């Protein structure tokens, strides 16, 4: 029993004494997050488009759910419109039902949207990156999940997929993605689109929504249409008709033989809408 007159001397030492006992250690106060690291309060409001907008009232994708888990969590890029979060949860559940491995969810948007250093879009809560790594998944520590960098599927010459990594299940996953509610398009590397054109059987209408774009060798980029209740949101033109397995796809590979142009001057993005500037403050 500790004598009462000794307690004042022992209290400052308690955190060190209990450090090896997680259940007993004194909880350290967590400082409040800066305002801009939290979503703006109030109803959901999307302003402008994915390359120059913002979102108020965003919700966060849970770190784990049926058929998925998030990675690189310290970036806090898992915020989006409620319909985007629901669609990703649907994708995880459908992937699980189809017998696919757990999916890794990567970036959505910042808590209030707006520009991101690693993306040109992802600004309005309507974009999400989903890893194409379909290897078996195992428990990871938080540090491992934060540092995870799944491998790409494209061969070094960029003209096709890596046969050691490409699987029939990739066709199934990408087809599942095109059936999500509100989906506008899925961006993948041109080599992945080319392989889908070769492998897809039966009804191939879903290929129209798979669009080739630079990069995107290790993940698919899901872009969702503006929700009907967001009049200030700006949609992109819809994908052109057809499967997209024609000369328009071949163009991407023809460019591999063209010498790269001289570096262009840095592009200065247009100013954000006034609402977004006020919402984001110093983020802009």
Feature roles, as predicted:
Residues 25-29:
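Boundary at the C-terminal end of the N-terminal hydrophobic targeting segment
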Residues 33-36, 87-118, 187-209:
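Extended, low-complexity, intrinsically disordered C-terminal regulatory tails
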């Amino acid at each position: 029993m500790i004598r009462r007159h000794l307690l004042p001397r022992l209290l400052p030492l308690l955190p060190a004494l209990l450090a090896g006992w997680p259940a007993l250690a004194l909880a350290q106060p967590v400082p409040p997050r800066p305002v801009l690291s939290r979503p703006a309060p109030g109803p959901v409001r999307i302003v402008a488009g994915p390359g120059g907008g913002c979102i108020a009232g965003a919700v966060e994708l849970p770190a784990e759910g049926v058929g998925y888990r998030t990675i690189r969590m310290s970036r806090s890029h898992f915020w989006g419109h409620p319909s985007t979060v629901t669609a990703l949860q649907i994708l995880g559940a459908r992937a699980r039902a189809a017998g696919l491995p757990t999916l890794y969810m990567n970036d959505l948007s910042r808590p209030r949207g707006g520009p991101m250093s690693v993306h040109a879009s992802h600004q309005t809560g309507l974009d999400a990156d989903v890893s194409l790594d379909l290897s078996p998944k195992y428990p990871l520590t938080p540090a491992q999940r934060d540092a995870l960098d799944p491998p790409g599927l494209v061969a070094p010459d960029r003209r096709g997929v890596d046969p050691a990594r490409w699987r029939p299940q990739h066709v199934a996953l990408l087809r599942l993605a095109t059936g999500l509610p509100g989906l506008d398009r899925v961006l993948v590397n041109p080599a992945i689109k080319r392989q889908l054109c070769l492998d897809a059987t039966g009804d191939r209408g879903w290929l129209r929504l798979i669009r080739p774009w630079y990069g995107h060798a290790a993940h698919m980029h899901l872009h969702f249409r503006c929700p009907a209740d967001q009049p200030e949101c700006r949609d992109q033109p819809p994908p052109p008709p057809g499967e997209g397995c024609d000369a328009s796809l071949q163009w991407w590979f023809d460019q591999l033989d063209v010498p790269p142009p001289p570096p262009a001057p840095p592009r200065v993005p247009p100013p954000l809408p006034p609402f977004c500037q006020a919402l984001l403050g110093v983020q802009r």
